[in-house]
Swiss-Prot record:
It is an enzyme of class 1 (oxidoreductase). Produces nitric oxide (NO) which is implicated in vascular smooth muscle relaxation through a cGMP-mediated signal transduction pathway. NO mediates vascular endothelial growth factor (VEGF)-induced angiogenesis in coronary vessels and promotes blood clotting through the activation of platelets. FAD binds at H801, R941, Y943, S944, T959, A961, Y965, V978, C979, S980. The gene is NOS3. This is Nitric oxide synthase 3. Pfam families: FAD_binding_1 (PF00667), Flavodoxin_1 (PF00258), NAD_binding_1 (PF00175), NO_synthase (PF02898). The modification Phosphoserine is found at S117, S618, S636, S641, S839. It comes from Cavia porcellus (Guinea pig). Stimulated by calcium/calmodulin. Inhibited by NOSIP and NOSTRIN. Belongs to the NOS family.
Amino acid sequence: MGNFKSVGQEPGPPCGLGLGLGLGLCGKQGPASPAPVSASEPTRAPSSPPLPLPAPEHSPPLTRPPEGPKFPRVKNWEVGSIAYDTLSAQAQQDGPCTPRRCLGSLVFPRKLQGRPSQSPLPQEQLLGQARDFINQYYSSIKRSGSQAHELRLQEVEAEVVATGTYQLRESELVFGAKQAWRNAPRCVGRIQWGKLQVFDARDCRSAQEMFTYICNHIKYATNRGNLRSAITVFPQRFPGRGDFRIWNSQLIRYAGYRQQDGSVRGDPANVEITELCVQHGWTPGNGRFDVLPLLLQAPDEPPELFTLPPELVLEVPLEHPTLEWFAALGLRWYALPAVSNMLLEIGGLEFPAVPFSGWYMSSEIGMRNFCDPHRYNILEDVAVCMDLDTRTTSSLWKDKAAVEINVAVLHSYQLAKVTIVDHHAATASFMKHLENEQKARGGCPADWAWIVPPISGSLTPVFHQEMVNYFLSPAFRYQPDPWKGSGTKGTGITRKKTFKEVANAVKISASLMGTVMAKRVKATILYGSETGRAQSYAQQLGRLFRKAFDPRVLCMDEYDVVSLEHETLVLVVTSTFGNGDPPENGESFAAALMEMSGPYNSSPRPEQHKSYKIRFNSVSCSDPLVTSWRRKRKESSNTDSAGALGTLRFCVFGLGSRAYPHFCAFARAVDTRLEELGGERLLQLGQGDELCGQEEAFRGWAQAAFQAACETFCVGEDAKAAAKDIFSPKCSWKRQRYRLSTQAQGLQLLPGLIHVHRRKMFQATILSVENLQSSKSTRATILVRLDTGGQEGLQYQPGDHIGICPPNRPGLVEALLSRVEDPPPPAESVAVEQLEKGSPGGPPPGWVRDPRLPPCTLRQALTFFLDITSPPSPRLLRLLSTLAEEPSEQQELETLSQDPRRYEEWKWFRCPTLLEVLEQFPSIALPAPLLLTQLPLLQPRYYSVSSAPSAHPGEIHLTVAVLAYRTQDGLGPLHYGVCSTWLSQLKTGDQVPCFIRGAPSFRLPPDPSLPCILVGPGTGIAPFRGFWQERLHDIESKGLQPAPMTLVFGCRCSQLDHLYRDEVQDAQQRGVFGRVLTAFSREPNSPKERHLRGAVPWAFDLPGPDTSSP
């Protein structure tokens, strides 16, 4: 099979394989570094290597200078290349061979078998192996020597001393299982080791649960013929307790019935297990291909018999592409090879029940299963049908018949669309794996006698490759059959189960499949958000996936990216900030994702010196490497190397606005990068435009993502029903599940804002607020000067942004409070509590405080923390429809919430605040807990810093357009900008909660001799004020002579809103600007072309209208 050959009853090749040179057990020694092939090296095949000459009897002792460590030297006799296996120095166990005997062809060497269950590993030995494994794990995630590494070592040591054993964390178990496959010397298909799906079944407590886990494993791995490698890990061996065991050598095997004449009908390799199944209650058939039931054993209990549901066992009837009579032979074989009798050792811990599966190499079926004399032995029957001369071996009838049987196997599996790989492709992939491992680890353990296939030996590249066989940990080991172990507990024969009992076990297992798989399949939902909307969507996604998975919802800055290598399913919901950048809480995730190595570029990227933001934005573009990788993935087979994220399935949803040029750029970059690193995309990137139907787009994508994930992991229920249940307003918010509790603690505003926005905040003080426009203007643009008080957290550079947390207007808050039913006392601090449902084995039902808001009065919540001015989302309208008492209003609200076109028209015409919605639908009864739990958070407003710290130490200047407008084509109510209006009303000494957000990609070039053109209409000039102040400071204080900059500015009228005209003219006179081009869009008697777009060509010396100001 693609992972391991079936080892229970299928011995390896016999002795006499060319003097054992290919076994690599006694290879030459060489220096640590590779050396070129010497001209004196033999070039003939290694069929008869010269024997070493005896040393002279009286030769004087040779004196040699001290040498460094030596490593096995391996040669490829086909191409002449030589390598040195340095990894072999880490071998932790002696091989079966001795200085006088080569035992490399033994199938079950004693040294490769696990310890008896009654012989626990001594504590010191266990500690040593545990330390070695923990060190391996932390080295793999690049955390070696970290505080977490040291704490984990201490934790493991304390656990071993206290209990005699220890427990692996899930990520450690996943790493250990993959490493065990990677280290398996006898497996030819290891290039796929990184794609092994690990199912953690260590919580299993009975044989019935074992059967349920196994059924789920088979269903997942079979995948309707598109086989996937998987392993299920049952509980580890524990001192003083019996083992979990699977008595069958493979999960799916055909019975072998011993006949009275001594012959066997069916598979002779399975006679013994067949008879055991009969003794334990199985009613046998009499066919050649009867699927055996499973004998499963829980600790200290007799084994129990379970029949596999027929729908789980995918079988392939065999036919030949040209020999029509072949189908009449009635041959068939099962799709899934799943070895189930081996022991997994990780860090000294032993797991005696670990069924693992991959896919078949065709020769395992065609040669071993059908042609071996001690198996089905059909070779002569096929030869007779082919009219071959079977009387003499020189006719090569065996070879001819064997080839046609293998052709039939490959043809039949491909016709049935069942994964299989031929021995030529498999061995070629192993050579690639050797090359990969030589680069990555300095070597690769390999057992030549098992790697070379049982057909076409020297026609495959592995035949000509010397190999070194050694044993690393973690590892798979053989173990004695459970019914043969001396002193094994609980192996007695139980009474025969009735057919009804067996059938009932199958029925119970089928009903538990989805539940158990859901408990095992974990989903990580990551969000990156500036406004909180992506977080809200991620939480909705978490509720949906809880229907069939075990999800957790995390902010990107809370997630350690190294965990991606051990994840099964990741869903990303993220917005994009500014010029295609990640949201601030996604910056660390983006940086770490860029530093991970992809499958086609294991070395660092050549552009590592660039800003990660610039590099990350480039990923979302049409990168030739990404295009090449996508094409390779589509054409790939199961012989390709997996990337760093080989076991990851993912899908991404992006939020943005098509009003900006970099729409969903960060989401597109994450989606591309995860695929580039080897992840498998379950669903195409979803995108939600805030200008039109964003929530509807998300709901459709979430449902499709849930459906795709359920199909991939063979779990769950109808996606439409689950999505309807989650997104239904009646199920989203229920009065009886929320209540207000009185809190003694009052609100402190700055700590409260820090709690809500999960970031550091600072208080700045107003120095002045000045209107920059003429008193004759109907609009206002203000210059706000803030005193930072020298706080380190408010240090900035020109080009950075400042985030300000404004309050809502008091009049709006008071009007909304008057609409709340049964509000708490005005001065009483409250918190929302939610009734959490209990779960089996978990905490009982109870009231849990909602942590979103700090304790505060309802008025404070509506003033400082909740957004009451933005148009309500469709989801909130659905909730309000359930609270409307008037049927017509209820119907209208439901229509608006469900019809994206109607909603967008209503939103853009009215742009209503929450209060205006309540005025339009007056029958809505508004409970206070709904406001506190369902309203979006009042988000910080970002402004470009409009000053330079060198020119104004301890100050931050802002250039802010004060927003005021009427909706409904100018006939609706007057709306005000939340932050701009508040800032315009502040007085000297007032406090402003704020923070700095850096913009490292928006800076003046470090080389002052480079030319700069600054283009900004209206308040777009704000950041450039900081640039010219910085440049002026450099000229006058540092004596720099920079290249003069060009400023292109646009406004309406030169006498009304020409911002900073005097400052600009002064800077130009001092050498900061070489040219200042100004366009006035509404200047009386001004030509129509005098807009900003007409001035830009002049800045680049391109043809265009002359818009220079006099």
